[in-house]
């Protein structure tokens, strides 16, 4: 396995290949990332993973500076998973000058949910994804890129980006990997204290309960009331929830009318202590 830091080094390593399988990450890897590498690997002729903590998607008050940087351990895990090339650019490598050209995704998808509570987040995500795609796939006839469904809205934004720019890239959405108690694996789980780690599973349980209540309702359910009850129940446990909501899988819009035949997803984000966690469940 090769570890490279510059775009020129990356392209040199990829010369001669025609279909990269790419897994972008911010490092501090867990089994969810490794599962994506294993799923993507058979779909390309070379497997690439990037490790880059992207400043553009962090607000000034968020955890950019404290986000764990664990390159050596991450590289060991990626090599064991069969990764061929690790692209670990420094900030000066990916952004040698201020990134004044940015990708602004459609507001109907990017200004809701995560985008509402983290303004500018999806601009930062879309910009770095487009830049990484340019680094990995430039000159390639086709390729595949893998993202985890835990970041459900992000996957949808990336799919729209690929569609709108006619990029010859297949997007693979990997299922959320969970701990035995149901907690979605996340790099930020490492912030949790032992007591918070025990409590953290209640986010996925709240989403499951909300989804079951929505599906059990006959006719046109009062989703606002069900969502409010779910928020209050989580808050009583000491959480600070941003949202717990039922949305259509197709576009993340609130469903209208009866829900019987509508593919839905329940999404949630809440802060436990100083750690903000997100999760979702398709129902």
Curated annotation (Swiss-Prot):
UniProt-annotated location(s): Cytoplasm
Q: Which residues form the active site?
A: 33 (proton donor)
For this protein, the record's SUPFAM superfamilies field holds: Nucleotidylyl transferase (SSF52374)
Q: From the UniProt record, list the reaction(s) this protein catalyses.
A: (R)-pantoate + beta-alanine + ATP = (R)-pantothenate + AMP + diphosphate + H(+)
Recorded GO cellular component terms are: cytosol
Q: Could you name the domain of life of the organism this protein comes from? A: Bacteria
Q: In which pathway does it act?
A: Cofactor biosynthesis; (R)-pantothenate biosynthesis; (R)-pantothenate from (R)-pantoate and beta-alanine: step 1/1
Q: What else is known?
A: The reaction proceeds by a bi uni uni bi ping pong mechanism.
Name it.
Pantothenate synthetase
Provenance organism: Polaromonas naphthalenivorans (strain CJ2)
